[in-house]
Amino acid sequence: MDRLADYLLVQTEHPLTDTQQQTVQTLGQQLKAKGGYHKRLNRQVQKTSKSKASARLIMGIEAPEFFEATEHHLRYRLSFNEGYSTGLFLDMRDNRHRLLSNLIEPGFPVFEKGTGAAKVLNTFAYTCSLSVCAARAGAITTSLDLSQKYLEWGRENFRLNKLNPDDHDFIYGDTFDWMKRLAKRGEKYDLVILDPPTFSRSKVSGLFQAKRDYGRLAGNASALVRKNGMLLACCNSSGLAPSDFKADVRRGIRDAGRKIVQSFQAMQPLDFPVGENEPAYLKVSWMRLN
């Protein structure tokens, strides 16, 4: 169960039992929630319509089409009507805070001091929450996504936090295509963020599958990281084992002629528990490259 501002969101693979429904009602009253929603998890999300993927109201009053929630003093625009996601992936909360605070762990900052305003490239940017954190930390951001709708959502997230989106770049396009273009221009970034979906389809580069293509993605991204800059590689595909993810990323970095000089493997948050029936799906690696 997630709490998003004044609303609760319950996610299960199966319909709620009467007992579970009553638990939601009880917790809703205790937390003084205005409403509660239920979302059926579907592993075939690519084949599911937006209406079927969206959460449905099971208690209280309906949320507005768009509403705001606060995380680490930053505001984000959310919705229960936009399909599988609400606009913010809560399992990345800790990593947003690392970026916002410019501290991955003691002695390991995201951005080195004395380099001026850092440049950040956020690929597969979705609603640009990581870009907002980077911008609030003083960076100049470029958000790249294949959806005009979500890029505009990202601009609104900037406005909600009194950040002028006109001071930052928002690029509509294919990540692989734009990485090539940026490399030809000689662009270099202090941080390149990779947080792709498990599957993605583009007219330019075709089908992206994290399990098959992450190494190539990491290699292309590494070419855009300046010396002693950072690569943030994230993957939420349960089909890609942590050991394989690590090997794929490191192979891509090596093929690009780069080396990792410092790294940190972020754990899946405690409120996304790992068990025998629910192995860890989230892989996150912060890496400084030579």
Where do the language-model regions lie?
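S-adenosyl-L-methionine
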Residues: 147-193
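Conserved SAM-binding motif I beta-strand of class I
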Residues: 140-145
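Helix-to-beta-strand junctions that scaffold the AdoMet/dcAdoMet cofactor pocket
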Residues: 225-227
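Mobile active-site "lid"/loop adjacent to the S-adenosyl-L-methionine
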Residues: 150, 172, 189-220
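Conserved class I S-adenosyl-L-methionine
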Residues: 110-126
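C-terminal catalytic and target-recognition region of SAM-dependent MTase-like enzymes
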Residues: 230-290
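Conserved SAM-binding loop of SAM-dependent methyltransferases across substrates and taxa
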Residues: 127-139
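Non-catalytic substrate-recognition/targeting regions of SAM-dependent transferases
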Residues: 1-2, 18-90, 97
